[in-house]
């Protein structure tokens, strides 16, 4: 009788040990490495904390930055034409385009560093999603600043949303590393961009309150070239 009790206890402990094996890389690494490549569901990866919860939000934000980068590039091209000939505005929007593109590359590196895979066909809608709808970009100088300001506010709101999800989620979904990354690389920078563009828009609006604002716009463009 004692033999059967001991055998049952041994079998129970063995099943518990096997159940725990799937939770740690050290218990499955030999099996995983015996194949040609780690499977997508392997525990031997760089994913930890709340990356599963936040990855779709970051993916959406990457797509938004890429879309806005091309919008800014179109604005820069518009003001670089011989008809408009506004090199100051061209410089401003070219800089914003380059920054958004570089932010996309940095985010792609961050996602892959954390064990994620970037899929540009993924569409994730949330309260922090940035609109990628493209409106009319052939606008005058003042309206272009208003358009850029709206875009920067959208990007800032999107970054704030990702940071909030990484910070205020449940214990299993919280990700302090990603929250710190967004705080260090996006929130302060985008707050400064919103402040700068809002100042530009207000200054130019005041300068244009004259019967013929062409000289005011020309001087403002000269100012932008020096920034």
From Swiss-Prot:
Induction note: Up-regulated by iron-supplemented diet in the anterior part of the gut of third instar larvae and adults (at protein level).
Knockout-associated phenotype: Embryonic lethal with some embryos displaying cuticle and nervous system defects. RNAi-mediated knockdown is lethal at the late pupal stage. Also the levels of ferritin heavy chain Fer1HCH are reduced. RNAi-mediated knockdown in the midgut causes growth delays and reduces survival rate only in the presence of the iron chelator BPS. Also, results in gut iron accumulation and systemic iron deficiency, reduces Mvl transcription and aconitase activity. RNAi-mediated knockdown in the eye does not affect eye morphology; however, the eyes develop degenerative vacuoles.
Residues in Ferritin-like diiron domain copies: 48-208
Presence of keyword Transmembrane helix: no
The keyword Magnesium is assigned to this record: no
Localization in the cell: Golgi apparatus; Secreted
CDD domains membership: Euk_Ferritin (cd01056)
GO molecular function per UniProt: ferric iron binding; ferrous iron binding; ferroxidase activity
Origin: domain of life: Eukaryota
GO CC term, one of those recorded: cytoplasm
InterPro entries, A to Z: Ferritin, Ferritin-like, Ferritin-like_diiron, Ferritin-like_SF, Ferritin_DPS_dom
Disulfide pairings: 25-44
Signal peptide as annotated in the record: 1-19
Tissue-specificity statement: Expressed in hemolymph, gut, ovaries and to a lesser extent in testes (at protein level). Expressed in the head (at protein level).
Principal localisation: Golgi
Keywords of the record: Disulfide bond, Golgi apparatus, Iron, Iron storage, Metal-binding, Secreted, Signal
Subunit structure and binding partners: Oligomer of 12 light (L) chains and 12 heavy (H) chains; L and H chains are disulfide-linked. The functional molecule forms a roughly spherical shell with a diameter of 12 nm and contains a central cavity into which the insoluble ferric iron core is deposited.
Protein's recorded name: Ferritin light chain
């Amino acid at each position: 009788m004692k033999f059967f009790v001991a055998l049952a206890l041994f079998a129970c402990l063995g099943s518990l040990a096997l159940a725990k094996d799937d939770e740690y890389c050290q218990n499955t690494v030999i099996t995983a490495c015996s194949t040609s490549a780690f499977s997508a569901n392997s525990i031997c990866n760089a994913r930890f904390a709340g990356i599963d919860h936040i990855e779709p939000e970051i993916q959406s934000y990457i797509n938004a930055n890429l879309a806005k980068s091309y919008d800014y590039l179109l604005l820069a091209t518009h003001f670089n034409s011989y008809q408009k000939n506004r090199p100051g505005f061209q410089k401003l929007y070219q800089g914003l385009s380059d920054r958004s593109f570089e932010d996309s590359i940095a985010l792609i590196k961050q996602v892959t560093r954390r064990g994620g895979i970037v899929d540009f066909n993924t569409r994730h809608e949330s309260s922090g999603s940035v609109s990628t709808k493209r409106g009319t970009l052939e606008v005058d100088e003042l309206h272009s600043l208003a358009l850029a300001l709206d875009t920067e506010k959208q990007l800032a709101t999107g970054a704030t949303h990702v940071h909030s999800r990484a910070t205020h989620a449940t214990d299993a979904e919280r990700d302090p590393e990603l929250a710190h990354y967004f705080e260090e690389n996006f929130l302060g920078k985008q707050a400064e961009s919103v402040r700068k563009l809002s100042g530009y828009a207000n200054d130019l609006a005041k300068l244009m309150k004259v019967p013929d604002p062409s000289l005011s716009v020309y001087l403002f463009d000269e100012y932008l070239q020096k920034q």
